[in-house]
Regions:
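Helical substrate-recognition/capping region of FAD-dependent monooxygenase/halogenase enzymes
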Residues: 3-227
Length: 227
């Protein structure tokens, strides 16, 4: 955080975790009360099924703050609720045609994940990619096209998704993906969308393919906000 992010970011830990901790305490109280009742066998079973996702940590939902946007554009990707944990889905990595879970490609490297889901004719995506950029050490930016794997070539993707890395400046080809199924599975608009995922794998925001993505990150990276 030091000199890279505004100090206000530190406050979000408390504002996010306190309500989550209270929800967990309330859950434990209700669960332990049911378990202590010898006549509540069916109630215990029903409650366990209902609360399974919560107990697994998948129902935590953070409210809007510095690192969680509003939900004005949630309809562009209904399967990735803002403020909740990123729910992975399978897509095809174009460079080797392997079907993989997007979420399994996350590395514990402290970077943000940005998923640009292309519009049908790729016009909006290409325009957006011309002006948007973040350092490779800050964000991992991937594109997912609607078309089948062999209808897309890696070199057709904007340079934003083919950054040169390492001492030899070798182009990274692993950021170009396809996956017509993921659009239907996760309720992603055919007009395109950008899903921003925090380093802790919680969805920070859903945006259209426009300057709203840049505006979200500007408040995190503007030197005037960093002491």
């Amino acid at each position: 955080v030091y000199k890279r992010q505004p100090q206000e970011l530190l406050k979000t830990y408390g504002t996010e975790r306190q309500p989550a901790a209270q929800n967990l305490i309330d859950f434990d109280k209700e669960w332990s009360s049911l378990m202590a009742d010898p006549n509540a066998t069916q109630e215990v079973a029903d409650y366990y099924v209902e609360a399974e996702a919560f107990a697994a940590g998948m129902m935590t939902e953070y409210s809007q703050n510095l690192v969680v946007s509003d939900t004005a554009h949630q309809d562009l990707a209904t399967g990735f609720p803002v403020g909740r944990r990123f729910k992975s889905a399978i897509a095809t990595r174009r460079c080797d045609a392997r079907k993989l879970h997007l979420g399994h490609e996350h590395q514990a490297d402290g970077r943000w994940r940005i998923y640009a889901f292309a519009d049908t004719d790729k016009t909006k995506l290409n325009e957006w990619a011309k002006s948007f950029n973040l350092p490779v050490d800050f964000a991992d930016i991937k594109v997912i096209y609607q078309q089948p794997c062999h209808d897309i070539e890696v070199l057709d993707a904007p340079e934003l998704f083919r950054p040169k890395v390492g001492t030899l400046n070798i182009p990274m080809w692993e950021n170009v993906w396809t996956g017509e199924d993921i659009f239907a599975e996760r309720g992603i608009s055919r007009d395109g969308a950008v899903v921003v995922v925090r380093p802790d794998q919680y969805v920070a925001g859903v945006f259209p393919l426009d300057e709203s993505v840049e505006n979200f990150f500007k408040r995190l990276r503007d030197p005037q906000t960093v002491e």
